[in-house]
Regions:
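Conserved nucleotide-binding/hydrolysis modules and their immediate coupling elements
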Residues: 1-83
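A generic structural motif
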Residues: 30-31, 68-77, 129-135, 377-383
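Functional cores that coordinate and move charged inorganic groups
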Residues: 93, 113-224
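A conserved active-site cap/scaffold subdomain adjacent to cofactor or substrate pockets
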Residues: 204, 208, 216-263
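Hydrophobic helix-and-loop "lid/oligomerization" segment in the mid-to-C-terminal part
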Residues: 248-340, 349
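Divalent metal-coordination and catalytic microenvironments
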Residues: 43, 105-107, 131, 201, ...
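Active/ligand-binding-proximal structured segments within catalytic/core domains
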Residues: 37-52, 80-131, 377
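Glycine-rich, acidic loop segments that terminate in or are immediately followed by a histidine
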Residues: 198-210, 233, 304-408
Length: 408
């Protein structure tokens, strides 16, 4: 049985210990110790990592998990049973996890006390934490929740833990949450004058250690809300990143940080106006270009053929332009536009032409080395840019004219 020193002092980061067993594992070796400061993966909190040092060497502990009767330390190299070691955890990692977890207790208590929202899920990753509440909260309630939790943290309330011998011993405690299926001893973490909750993880000694609590996101989740939060140094890093981003924007717009939102909105409005003007101008240019294309239509049998290279026309504008280029008489339109890397093409015909555009597109694909398809009156495709494109286009134009003349 391993003595769990982290339950006695959450700020203890090293201890002397003896290796009880060492067995090969899939990714190294699994060690058990007679006592440890390493917290395992449990209670929604990630495990500690660190080092085991001994005369003549050291091994890295990459993780720790709980089994039925022991804590298993995952090490990169073996340490013989009976070896005396000094176990040391990554203090920064542990303190970060304690800040987030104690902050989660505080946020969950405030949500329950103020809005009756029950925490039904908690997850802590290396980048953020999430709390799942069983009812939705609006923007004003979220601000109130964040403010209340920060005010309690600033009061530097004591955080204590106590173990109870049975479920019956918990009667009378103001428990916010009681995890199911717990076996004795049952550990309860209490924040002075606030939260009381069963929990197996190490926590901050006082709420002042949490630092700032910041809600970064809130999304609807199973009829409730999933909150994403940051505490302590994570919140500081987030605030610094956001401040620096706003600072860069302020310099970009040559304005003060407090005016960035207005400057961005002004640019967005100007961009929207410019896009509207561009669309209007583009429509006029397309109409003019379509008129030129219709004027250049050539008779081929009973129909007219409009075939042209229209470089500079965007791919998304090619089909609308082809539709505008249709004449009053039966017409087949073949347009091709090339940029630096790709050739886009479209085949479009009016009713009565008597040809299937999907079939003709296969001939274009073969001639240009492209891919595309369609059926009936419309087909389109694309191909890599290649030498001799103008010659290939001229040959395709002749082929289409020949097909039109042969159509009945």
């Amino acid at each position: 049985m391993t003595r769990r020193l982290y339950l006695e002092d959450s700020h203890l980061t090293r201890c002397r210990a003896r290796v009880l067993s060492c067995t090969p594992a899939q990714a190294g070796y699994d060690l058990t110790l007679d006592q440890t400061v390493f917290f395992p993966n449990a209670g929604g909190q990630p495990c500690d990592t660190g080092t085991l040092r001994f005369p003549g060497g050291a091994v890295t502990v990459t993780g720790c998990d709980e089994t039925d009767d022991a804590l298993v330390h995952h090490a990169d190299r073996p340490v013989p049973a009976g070896t005396d070691v000094e176990a040391e955890i990554d203090r920064a990692r542990r303190f970060d996890h304690m800040q987030q977890h104690t902050g989660e207790h505080l946020l969950s208590w405030c949500a329950f006390q103020r809005f009756g929202a029950v925490n039904v899920g908690f997850h802590l990753s290396e980048a953020y934490g999430t709390i799942d509440l069983d009812r939705p909260l609006d923007a004003a309630q979220l601000q109130e929740l964040e403010q209340a939790a920060n005010e309690l943290a600033a009061r530097d309330l004591a955080v204590t833990a106590a173990s109870y011998a049975s479920e019956a011993a918990l009667e009378g405690l103001p428990l916010r949450k009681h995890a199911e299926g717990l076996t004795a001893p049952i550990r309860v973490v209490t924040i002075e004058g606030a939260d009381c909750c069963t929990c197996c993880a190490p926590h901050c000694a006082r709420t002042g250690e949490i630092g700032m609590l910041f809600l970064t996101d809130a999304v609807a989740w199973k009829g409730g809300v999933r909150l994403t939060f940051l505490c302590g140094l994570r919140a500081l890093r987030h605030a610094r990143a956001m401040h620096d981003a706003v600072d860069r924007l302020a310099r970009r717009f040559s304005t003060g940080r407090e005016n960035v939102e207005a400057a961005v909105q002004k640019q967005a409005d100007e961009l929207s106006a410019a896009r509207r003007a561009e669309r209007a101008l583009g429509a006029r240019v397309s109409a003019y270009l379509a008129q030129e294309l219709r004027a250049g239509a050539e008779r081929a049998g009973r129909a007219l053929l409009v075939a042209a290279q229209v470089d500079g026309v965007e791919a998304k504008a090619l089909r609308p332009l082809a539709q505008q280029a249709l004449c009053n008489a039966p017409t087949l339109v073949f347009l091709l536009a090339a940029d630096e890397s790709r050739v886009q093409y479209v085949l479009l015909c009016s009713d009565g032409v008597g040809l299937d555009m999907g079939e003709l597109c296969q001939a274009v694909n073969a001639a240009l080395g492209g891919k595309g398809g369609g059926r009936g009156t419309m087909a389109q495709g694309s191909a890599p840019v290649r030498d001799g494109l103008s010659e290939a286009f001229a040959q395709l134009k002749g082929y289409l004219a020949q097909r039109l003349r042969a159509a009945r």
